[in-house]
Amino acid sequence: MNLKKIRYKGDVEDTKELFDVYKVQQIIKSHEEILKEHITFREKLLADSVRLTPIISPRIYKIIETVKKDFGLKQKIEFFSLMENSYNAFAFKQKNLISVVFTSALLENFDDAEIKFVLGHELGHIIYDHNKLLLLYNPDKQSTTFLPILAEKKFLTWRKKAEISCDRVGLAACKKYEFAVQSLLKITYGLTEKNLNFNLPELMKQLDDLAKSEYMAELSTSSHPLLPVRLKAIELFSNSQLFKKSGKLTAEELHAKTDELLSLTKFYPRTKVKEMMMKLVAAGGISMIAADKEINLEEIKSLVKILADVFTDDPESEIIYDKDKALKQLETSEKYLKQHGTDIDRYYTLHFLTLISLSDGKFTKTEKEVLMNTAESIGLSKEDAMDVVWKTLQQNGITIDVRLNEIAQNVQEHYADYLKE
């Protein structure tokens, strides 16, 4: 099977964007240089785990050789067992040596076909060079990655798509959908067929119940898609012509259906009220930015950042460039929020708009008027609106120093002329 052809197109596209648009190769290269100064993880494995050679574990060696032959892999693979009671596995590559690590619990409780699925999945990350992008994770956990917000959004979206690609490689290794299902059920839920009668439509109902919850937005930062999504994606692939010639789905149909499935995991408002809050912030933010007759980049960046932080993976799609359409959206969302929103919804909407107004280092009379008009339109009294504005100012201050910007601009202009000489 051509592993390059079965890779999920969404994974390929997002990887390309991360490198071409966000230039992540510089961060990856820097991280690789830092890691060279530390003891390698392989050295730790040699000290803390057992390497399963053909003599020590002929069973595992046979599985590895079978999968290598099926995939046409020529690189050497070494296999480690790490003593741990949970089911887990990972792989990494140093030069031309691939190291695969399974926990002892997984090896003891998974049959050969299930191990093939997990092995194929982990090798998929190596084959598709995913592990380089994983160097973008920030190990100190203060932030998810080393990336700015929009790049991080793209990275987290890509991460889930990468898992879809590798699940396909896992299926290619174990050959049957049932084996892939059994493996993922054990890893995720700790359940076997003894206690679980697998029924994908029933599991998808669980996802349907969760889909309308705002908790789904929190799950958007997780590295893996929810299990029902993964199982459905594998089922789609197993019925495609990419997996078998007799498959019902063409490559294009598979891609479209997988895209639709993955959209369930995106970061986007799950309730109508929150969606209207987002649309009001998008349209109201632009209206306020334009009110001073001066389009300030700091205010625009603040608007986009708030949309990305609070509401959506794709903030640009919420910006309306047609003035009449933006005004109509503003009126519609204001009316909806007044009728259906809570005081908390109205408070935070005005809070976000206030943050945008402060982001250029000024708070003008015109901006205040726009905020007060918006407050009235969504059902906040003038007193409550001023309370929101004042508390936002107290909590966040004015982060842009106008005088500092003037100095920086003077220096920039001076040295621009100097460099021309």
What is the predicted function of each stretch?
Residues 97-98, 140-149:
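Short, conserved phosphate-binding/catalytic loop or strand-edge motifs used
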Residues 68-76, 85-112, 129:
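Active-site scaffold of zinc-dependent metalloenzymes
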Residues 78, 132-137, 176-186, 319, ...:
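Acidic/histidine metal-binding catalytic segments
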Residues 1-74:
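A metal-dependent hydrolase signature that marks the N-terminal structural subdomain at the beginning
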